[in-house]
From Swiss-Prot:
Known function: Catalyzes the transfer of a methyl group from 5-methyltetrahydrofolate to homocysteine resulting in methionine formation.
Species: Mycobacterium avium (strain 104)
Annotated positions binding 5-methyltetrahydropteroyltri-L-glutamate: R20, E21, L22, K23, K114, R517, C518, W563, E607
Matching CDD domains: CIMS_C_terminal_like (cd03311), CIMS_N_terminal_like (cd03312)
List of residues binding L-methionine: I433, G434, S435, E486, D601
Positions annotated as active site in the UniProt record: H696 (proton donor)
Cofactor(s) for this UniProt protein: Zn(2+)
Pathway: Amino-acid biosynthesis; L-methionine biosynthesis via de novo pathway; L-methionine from L-homocysteine (MetE route): step 1/1
UniProt catalytic activity: 5-methyltetrahydropteroyltri-L-glutamate + L-homocysteine = tetrahydropteroyltri-L-glutamate + L-methionine
PANTHER family per the UniProt record, alphabetical: 5-METHYLTETRAHYDROPTEROYLTRIGLUTAMATE--HOMOCYSTEINE METHYLTRANSFERASE
Name of protein: 5-methyltetrahydropteroyltriglutamate--homocysteine methyltransferase
GO BP terms, alphabetized: methionine biosynthetic process; methylation
């Protein structure tokens, strides 16, 4: 059967629901408030509505199997029967799935890390020597049948074998998972046959790992694997999707295989990639010309120029997003606070689908068929270029002056001596990362302020009560360096964005970060200006309640960029320095108010690292420079902390040392302190707090378990440089879990401290 050619599609779509319906349903299931049937009903409704919406918008090929209760890599591990043995102890299949993702009282979860250079996090499959791959196609077949029954032109989407293995982790003495590639090829061939038998005309195999340097042999592997899969006797047409960058030599390798279509990212990859591969002349090129991971409206005329150029290089050209629209909010429609100019510059998920359809129509019927849409696009481009909010000469001049004079602090040893004399901390000092649980009282107060039910003064009174409660709890637990708990912050980036000029905070711009965790990234559209102190009042109030040091809590410039939708009209380095200047001014004000410890979090340092090694040195240069610009305005006696998480740190370990923070806390519990060896390898000599327990799991770790982690850390870090802290902030945990876990953490620190 010859597959029906398609002209307009998207790589994938979000699954949380336009009103975060899936978040509420899964959290209700985890808490035992609802049953499996209700969760499955919500999921089925979301799938149905998503597919219907995409088809009604004009897509003639709709991705299915992009829905997930938690994560698509975890779904693929289930499909390949590759869950670890400890998760298999759970008898119910859905509970087993969630145990692998989140853990439970008996099962430690799988690791979680960043999905390439995005703010989405995936669950890292573990491949052991005993892992025996086998096909479990129930989910993908079920969703295909659902969609076809609905009359949807459905295209199942599955993570490809190369990407699955390169993003997995070998355990228990196993080598690199990619060594198992030959075992997966026949399983994928079996899957293709089943999909064809069940009515699939096309299948999409996602291979974003091909745009990275993760494997030097990737081009040859891609050609070998897809020669075999493309030669299968019974299969749908194969569309191999690459995204997030340039597939390089892998593109030519794929083009030499029998696959029918290849997707290329023409937003984050070069426009010339396709023209350089003559073998694509017989293929469908799925051209990712609409940005799937940022919120700016597409310049339709420029995109159409790219597409027109491609027509001479491929048998067919289909229009698509550059990647899944999972990374952007659902729609601009709920954003009623947007001014007309800013609204005209933006496109969220629904608007991006419309852009794809418009461009496909222009390719089919000519530019004159979409003349009105192109005119509106041109007007938006012109409006954005001329808006005075985009440039602030005073900010730019200040940055140039500080950078020219140098942004380095004093000698680390001298700083440590000065801080020791000021703080008088015990060996193995205990602290937490920053946030404490956002209670229902906090959420109700925030909602009441938004609705006008209470005024700002009453809101601040309630938040101060929450701060006082958190300070009291920490003192009762015996922590050494305290935090104020951040009750006034809905999000560690949005809180600052709402107070800085150059940002717009959305009302409903939710995107999935991991599992049920959703974030609302602000939009950074112009030059960044700090007009007033943002945290000083809250931190000094907390400090007034205790004699112990309370950390000032700030978000670093790179993380603010990584967790925002950032302007694309100037280099990221310039924007990072503008944010860094605002944070620098805040650190100076905190110090002037008597705060002795200031934490500038950079959990996203690894996230923005370019996927190709050739581009990484320049990024790390300006990222480190922005952090130092933000933190070099304070005295030696002020202790600067930073925190990093959610990442594999190996590729940025040298940069972590170059940040020159006095204390660096790191996510380390799930990876069993591996990061400490990496730090030692680059001569890291400042203090470090490797996370001693995993806060992303509801498990309460025992005192003995934490003490064991501390002793493991002491084998790599001397006691005078070791801090004791959880992996990450505690915002998403419930108060009982937090109290029990911290009680055990402090007890473990005292136990180990006694033996130092």
């Amino acid at each position: 059967m010859t597959p029906q050619a398609f002209t307009a599609t998207v790589v994938g779509s979000p699954r949380i629901g336009p009103k975060r319906e899936l978040k509420r349903a899964t959290e209700g299931y985890w808490a035992g408030r609802t049953g499996r049937a209700e969760l499955e009903k919500v999921a089925a409704t979301l799938r149905r509505d998503t597919w219907a919406g995409l088809a009604a918008a004009g897509l003639d090929s709709v991705p299915v199997n992009t829905f997930s209760y938690y994560d698509q890599m975890l779904d693929t591990a289930v499909m390949l029967d590759a869950l670890p043995e400890r998760a298999r102890q759970v008898s119910d299949d859905l509970d087993r799935y969630f145990a692998a993702a989140r853990g439970n009282s008996d099962v430690a979860p799988l690791e979680m890390t960043k999905w390439f250079d995005t703010n989405y996090h995936y669950i890292v499959p573990e491949i052991a020597p005993t892992t025996k791959f086998a096909l479990n196609p129930d989910k993908v077949l079920s969703e295909l049948k659902e969609a076809l029954a609905q009359g949807i032109p459905a295209r199942p989407v599955v993570i490809g074998p190369i990407t699955f293995l390169l993003l997995s982790k070998g355990v228990d003495g196993a080598g690199g998972p990619i060594e198992r590639l030959e075992e997966l090829v026949p399983i994928y061939a079996e899957l293709l046959s089943l999909l064809a038998d069940n009515g699939a005309q096309w299948v999409q195999l996602d291979e974003p790992a091909l745009v990275t340097d993760m494997c030097a042999d990737a081009p040859a592997l891609a050609e070998a694997v897809y020669n075999k899969l493309g030669s299968a006797a019974n299969r749908p047409a194969i569309y191999v999707a690459t995204y997030f960058g340039d597939p390089g030599a892998s593109l030519a390798g794929l083009a030499r295989t029998p696959v029918e279509a290849i997707g290329v990212d023409l937003v984050y990859g070069p426009d010339t990639a396709v023209a350089a591969v003559p073998e694509l002349a017989g293929k469908t090129v799925v051209a990712g010309v609409v940005d799937g991971r940022n919120v700016w409206r597409t310049d339709l005329a420029a995109a159409l120029d790219k597409l027109t150029t491609l027509l001479g290089s491929a048998a067919r050209v289909a229009v698509s997003t550059s990647c899944s629209t999972l990374h952007v909010p659902y729609s601009l429609e709920p954003e009623t606070d947007l001014d007309d100019a800013l609204r005209s510059w933006l496109a969220f998920g629904r608007e991006k689908v419309a852009e794809v359809v418009t461009l496909a129509r222009a390719l089919r019927d000519g530019r004159e068929a979409v003349a009105d849409e192109i005119a509106a696009s041109n007007a938006a481009v012109a409006s954005r270029k001329s808006d005075p909010r985009l440039h602030n000469d005073r900010v730019r001049a200040r940055i140039d002056s500080i950078v020219a004079s140098g942004s380095h602090r004093g000698d680390p040893a001298q700083r440590r001596a000065s801080q020791d004399a000021r703080l008088h901390l015990p060996p193995l000092p205990t602290t937490t990362i920053g946030s404490y649980p956002q209670t229902s009282a906090i959420r109700k107060a925030r909602a009441a302020l938004r609705s006008g039910e209470i005024d700002q003064a009453e809101y601040e009174r309630r938040m101060k009560k929450e701060i006082a409660d958190v300070i009291t709890l920490q003192e009762q637990l015996g922590l050494d360096v305290l935090v104020h708990g951040e009750p006034e912050r809905n999000d560690m980036v949005q809180y600052f964005a709402e107070q800085l000029e150059g940002f717009f905070a959305t009302q409903n711009g939710w995107v999935q970060s991991y599992g049920s965790r959703c974030v609302r990234p602000p939009i950074l559209y112009g030059d960044v200006v700090r007009t007033h102190p943002m945290t000083v009042e809250w931190i000094t109030y907390a400090q007034s309640l205790t004699d112990k040091p309370v950390k000032g809590m700030l978000t670093g410039p790179v993380t603010i960029l990584a967790w925002s939708f950032v302007r694309d009209d100037q280099p990221l380095a310039d924007t990072a320095n503008q944010v860094a200047l605002a944070i620098r001014d805040e650190t100076v004000d905190l110090q002037a108010a008597g705060i002795a410890v200031i934490q500038v979090d950079e959990p996203a340092l690894r996230e923005l690292l370019p996927l190709r090694r050739a581009d990484q040195e320049e990024y790390l240069r300006w990222a480190v420079g922005a952090f130092r610009l933000a933190t070099s305005g304070v005295a030696d006696s002020t202790q600067i902390h930073t925190h990093l998480c959610y990442s594999e740190f190996g590729e940025v370990i040298g940069a972590i040392a170059d940040l020159d923070a006095d204390v660096t806390s790191l996510e380390a519990a799930r990876s069993h302190m591996e990061v400490l060896d990496d730090l030692n390898a680059v001569g890291f000599s400042n203090s470090v707090g490797p996370g001693v327990y995993d806060i992303h799991s509801p498990r309460v770790p025992s005192t003995a378990e934490i003490a064991e982690s501390l002793r493991a850390a002491l084998r790599a870090v001397p006691a005078e440089r070791l801090w004791v802290n959880p992996d990450c902030g505690l915002k998403t945990r419930n108060p009982d879990e937090v109290s029990a876990s911290l009680k055990n953490m402090v007890a473990a620190a005292h136990e180990v401290r006694a033996g130092v």
